[in-house]
């Protein structure tokens, strides 16, 4: 580049063809324009070219030079500046190439025209060939596929407005991309549906006859109540009292016993009231059935949990949160209270930038630190939407090479571990979660009958067909088969009726 007051470099550019201000016979001008040195005679000859070269070389050695690898920047079409010599700036240029087309070289004192690369910029400078942005504006981004300019060893500069992402092993940073993620669907395949041709008064009469006189026709009760939806059973209750002036629930209690009675009475409660009584039973007396609390609060919908709070307060004159606080403690208590709010995000959209942030925070709260920040797991697992968390679990697996469940097992223990695992399993695959619970209820010596009854009744109109399929897939035997082998009598009959068939 030529500047006024400096002699032209050796091998300078010959005049470009054509006329005009910057070419033709008038270029270069016969004399330099006045620049304030008019009184200095022969000023151009006063500068020693060797001195200039030596000064530049000295500066290059002092400040580290600016050695640029050859071919780092592509040349402009039709020619352009020659590559920087290996010795750094200030060295005599090599032989110049052929004359480029008109307009490629800048005017004296100017910059290269748009589209012609210049020397490597400083970090944060505009991409070569692009103008400086106006004050207050961010410089434009690099060309597609080109990394932002940085100092050696410096991490790439994030786009304007985006925070730099922390570095985690095996986890590349990503922008705020929001791809379309299909929403996770809840199961809606129950074994019990509304009976066709339903007549509540006729069913009330059938039940009356089954309990009248000496003995009880348990099979008639099983056939009637085991094939009606909960909504229809509530109508039977009303019709029974209307027709006979008696409470059907009291009659059933007086005629039935054992686990068969418990199953029939569970069928007669509304789903909300049934859960309220199950929670009450889980926390009353000595000891707490933590697994019951976890199962109910981790698997129910927001609407169900909000209605459960109302029903609990009505039935037992204290809030569900007060009941939880009185019988649990620590991080497990906080988990249950968070779940009992029924306030999980229910959107189906997934923002992958938020997914990546949650993955990083979970990793930093557990695997990437000494100890565990349980509150961070609680905040993410209890508030984010189902679709969002499924994406988080998949991304966590990709980043760490470890399933989120394995990380929870490594970082937590006791009731908190079981609670967090239940939340994750329900979000991943609710039918598989209940299939595992059913298998554990019947595994080994003895049967956890309350768990067996609760799951069979509460899921009978939601996803019991899906639970059956998962059970067969996970354990190689049908749910029907295992119930048959682990129960007996009328209790077995009503459970098999609810199960709806063998797989």
UniProtKB/Swiss-Prot annotation:
Pfam families: Annexin. The modification N6-acetyllysine is found at residues 246, 253, 477. Residues 1-17, 80-145, 155-169 have a biased composition (Pro residues). One of its GO terms (molecular function) is calcium ion binding. Keywords: Acetylation, Annexin, Calcium, Calcium/phospholipid-binding, Cell cycle, Cell division, Cytoplasm, Cytoskeleton, Nucleus, Repeat. Residues 1-35, 56-178 are annotated as: Disordered. GO terms for cellular component: melanosome; midbody; nuclear envelope; nucleoplasm; plasma membrane; spindle; vesicle membrane. Annexin repeats lie at residues 198-269, 270-341, 353-425, 429-500. Its main location: cytoplasm. It is found in: Cytoplasm; Melanosome; Nucleus envelope; Nucleus, Nucleoplasm. Gene3D superfamilies: Annexin. PROSITE patterns: ANNEXIN_1, ANNEXIN_2. GO terms for biological process: cytokinetic process; phagocytosis. The keyword Repeat applies. A pair of annexin repeats may form one binding site for calcium and phospholipid. PANTHER family: ANNEXIN (PTHR10502), ANNEXIN A11 (PTHR10502:SF29). Belongs to the annexin family. Required for midbody formation and completion of the terminal phase of cytokinesis. Binds specifically to calcyclin in a calcium-dependent manner. Interacts with PDCD6 in a calcium-dependent manner. Interacts with KIF23 during cytokinesis. Interacts with S100A6. This is Annexin A11. It comes from Oryctolagus cuniculus. The gene is ANXA11.
């Amino acid at each position: 580049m030529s500047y006024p007051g400096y002699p032209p470099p050796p091998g300078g550019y010959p005049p470009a063809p054509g006329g005009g201000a910057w070419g033709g016979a008038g270029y270069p001008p016969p004399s330099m324009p006045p620049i304030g040195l008019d009184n200095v005679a022969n000023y151009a000859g006063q500068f020693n070219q060797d001195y200039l070269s030596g000064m530049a070389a000295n500066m290059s050695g002092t400040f580290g030079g600016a050695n640029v690898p050859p071919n780092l920047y592509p040349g402009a079409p039709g020619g352009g500046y020659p590559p920087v010599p290996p010795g750094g700036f200030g060295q005599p240029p090599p032989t110049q190439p052929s004359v480029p087309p008109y307009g490629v070289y800048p005017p004296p004192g100017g910059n290269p025209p748009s589209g012609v690369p210049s020397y490597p910029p400083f970090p944060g400078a505009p991409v070569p060939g692009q103008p400086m942005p106006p004050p207050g504006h961010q410089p434009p981004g690099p060309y597609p596929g080109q990394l932002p300019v940085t100092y050696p060893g410096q991490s790439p500069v994030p786009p304007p407005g985006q925070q730099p992402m922390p570095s985690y092993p095996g986890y590349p940073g990503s922008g705020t991309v929001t791809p379309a993620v299909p929403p996770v669907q809840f199961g809606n395949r129950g074994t019990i549906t509304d009976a066709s041709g339903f007549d509540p008064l006729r069913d009330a009469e059938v039940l009356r006859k089954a309990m009248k006189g000496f003995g009880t026709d348990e099979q008639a009760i099983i056939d009637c109540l085991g094939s009606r939806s909960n909504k229809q059973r509530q109508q039977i209750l009303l019709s029974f009292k209307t027709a006979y002036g008696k409470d059907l629930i009291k009659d059933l209690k007086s005629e039935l016993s054992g686990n068969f009675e418990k199953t029939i009475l569970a069928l007669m409660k509304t789903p909300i009231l049934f859960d309220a009584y199950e929670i009450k039973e889980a926390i009353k007396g000595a000891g707490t059935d933590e697994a019951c609390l976890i199962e109910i609060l981790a698997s129910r919908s927001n609407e169900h949990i909000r209605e459960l709070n109302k029903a609990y307060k009505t039935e037992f004159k204290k809030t569900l949160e007060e009941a939880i606080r009185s019988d649990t403690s620590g991080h497990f208590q906080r988990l249950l209270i968070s779940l009992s709010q029924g306030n999980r995000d229910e959107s189906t959209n997934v923002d992958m930038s938020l997914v990546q942030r949650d993955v990083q925070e979970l990793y930093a709260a557990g695997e990437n630190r000494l100890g565990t920040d349980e509150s961070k797991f609680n905040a993410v697992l209890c508030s984010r939407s189902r679709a969002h968390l499924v994406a988080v679990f998949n991304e966590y697996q990709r980043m760490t090479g470890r399933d989120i469940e394995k990380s929870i097992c490594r970082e937590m223990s006791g009731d908190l571990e079981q609670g967090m695992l239940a939340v994750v399993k329900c979000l991943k695959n609710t039918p598989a979660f209940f299939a595992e619970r059913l298998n554990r209820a019947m595994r080994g010596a003895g049967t956890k009958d309350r768990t067996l009854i609760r799951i069979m009744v509460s899921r009978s109109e939601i996803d019991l067909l899906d639970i059956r399929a998962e059970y067969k897939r996970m354990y190689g035997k049908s749910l029907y088969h295992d119930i048959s082998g682990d129960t007996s009598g009328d209790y077995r009959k009503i459970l098999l009726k609810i199960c709806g068939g063998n797989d």
